[in-house]
Amino acid sequence: MNRYELAQKIDHTLLRPNISLLDIERLCNEAKEFGFYSVCINPYYIPYAKELLKDTKVKICTVIDFPLGASTTSMKVYQVRESLKLGAEEFDMVINIGALKDKKRDYLISEIREVVKAAEGKVVKVIIETCYLTDEEKIYATEIIKEGGAHFVKTSTGFGPQGATVQDVRLLKSIAGNDLKVKASGGIRTFEQALEMINAGADRIGTSSGVSIINGLGK
């Protein structure tokens, strides 16, 4: 795997609440320099990032109902529509974790379908926050996401007590098969960690340490 191939698996991420426009500018400049697949940012910063990234191949990914996922379906749909108008090209939505634990299958499938519809063909990733789930619940969530028509199952927000693990990525991939991609995120800071996730089945890596990961290739 060369630097470009690795960079194309990375969503270069900055989702902390205490950031400035200068931080977003740095993020976008790094994405252009290193060739990251996307920048993943909060919706407020989409217009600024769109201007910085015009005439590049770097996509703009944003988060929906982040980081808790406990809003209503209509609220999530509204966020997607507004973010789409601003220029978002991919959407990372947090699943309703309480509804998942309560086995509200029909509700969750309907919600995912509504969000996918609102995204108008753009990529939708559903974050399940694996650190709060049993293995049975992780499998259940992945099956629901497949049925709902989303494009990725994503491990974590990065705001929970634990992020992605190799074991979780391997489990999610075993259920996702070829119908659903897997995004690993949360706590991935080194090239070695990223490679472990990719080898376990991750199609995309969400990280705020993209530059360090790329620079670690070949060391």
Swiss-Prot record:
This protein's UniProt keywords: Cytoplasm, Lyase, Schiff base
Cytoplasm as UniProt keyword: yes
Coiled-coil intervals, chain numbering: none
Family matches, as Gene3D superfamilies: Aldolase class I
A Pfam family per the record: DeoC
InterPro entries (UniProt xref): Aldolase_TIM, DeoC, DeoC/FbaB/LacD_aldolase, DeoC_typeI
Reactions performed catalytically: 2-deoxy-D-ribose 5-phosphate = D-glyceraldehyde 3-phosphate + acetaldehyde
Pathway the protein takes part in: Carbohydrate degradation; 2-deoxy-D-ribose 1-phosphate degradation; D-glyceraldehyde 3-phosphate and acetaldehyde from 2-deoxy-alpha-D-ribose 1-phosphate: step 2/2
Residues annotated as the enzyme's active site: 92, 154, 183
Protein's cellular compartments: Cytoplasm
Primary subcellular site in the record, as a coarse category: cytoplasm
Biological processes per GO annotation: 2-deoxyribose 1-phosphate catabolic process; carbohydrate catabolic process; deoxyribonucleotide catabolic process
GO cellular component, one term: cytoplasm
Family from the record: Belongs to the DeoC/FbaB aldolase family. DeoC type 1 subfamily.
Described purpose of this protein according to its UniProt entry: Catalyzes a reversible aldol reaction between acetaldehyde and D-glyceraldehyde 3-phosphate to generate 2-deoxy-D-ribose 5-phosphate.
NCBIfam families xref list: deoC
Record protein name field: Deoxyribose-phosphate aldolase
Organism listed in the record: Dictyoglomus turgidum (strain DSM 6724 / Z-1310)
